[in-house]
Amino acid sequence: MRRTILMWVVTAFGVLALGGVVVVASQQGWFGSKAQRWLTQADTAMKQHRWPEAQAHLDQLLSTMPDSPLIPSALLKLGEVQEAQQHLVEARAAYQQLLDQFRDSPLTSETQTHLGQVNVALLFSSTQTEMDAVYQVQPGDSLGKIAAINGTTVEFLQKANRMSRDVIRPGQKLKVPKGRFSVVVDKSQNQLLLTQGNQFVKTYHVATGANNSTPVGTFHITTRVPNPPWYSPQGVIPYGDPRNILGTRWMGFDKAGYGIHGSSDPSTIGQQVTAGCVRMNNSDVEELFDIVPMGAEVTVVD
């Protein structure tokens, strides 16, 4: 009789304990239902462009269930919601958090794409971030001089400071980048990485040399030419001629004959097909051209 009572007590205690665990698990969303519901509600709101509502669902998930396996998806969606509202600093923070905390996430590539778009948009905006500094124009300054001092381009200064003309005045304050821009080209991935200081800015798909013809090493930009002519073996082919393979921009290396340029055939991007140069889509090379100054370091790796 005593054994029966003891077994009953133990069983009852076990049931109560299990029940408590189930309740706590349910409250915490361990079974995934609550987290998934918030994520689904956020997704539905996003499709209907109800951004504040979507953000509220995502904030609830992120704040109450930080250990949920759905956190990477929530961070990506939060970044998209902030980006859609032009809250670029907040969008960047969400994307960066995902990349920092979940390095092996299958969402990494998609997140980097979003982060790159936001980073460039911030660079060219009037918004000041920790990656920017303020330069006060001195007597005798020109945009070219200011760009050289601050490791940037005239085009960058014009875009970031909403300048329609080259006219500046002493005492005027201009947004300039903090930290030098540099480039790494990965031949095996046909990918170009743009960094500012040691910080990721953006990756671009590129074409590199056929038969391993793109040289490996560290180079520097020594020429920058918009709308470049092509000095082909058959002679000079002007910009705009369909035979000109350089596209809309040329950034030459301190190794004769090599550089980064645009394309007359976008279908080749992502392949190893060039004579040794790094080829980009025209829209991408135009963007890069406005950021990367003379003297910028370019590292090419296998």
Predicted regions and their residues:
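Short solvent-exposed coil/turn linkers within tandem alpha-helical repeat scaffolds
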Residues: 62-71, 99-112, 153-155, 159-168
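Intrinsically disordered, low-complexity Ser/Thr-rich linker and spacer segments
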Residues: 100, 113-135, 175-200
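Gly/Pro-biased beta-strand-loop elements
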Residues: 178-264
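Exported/periplasmic cell-wall-interacting domains
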Residues: 237-302
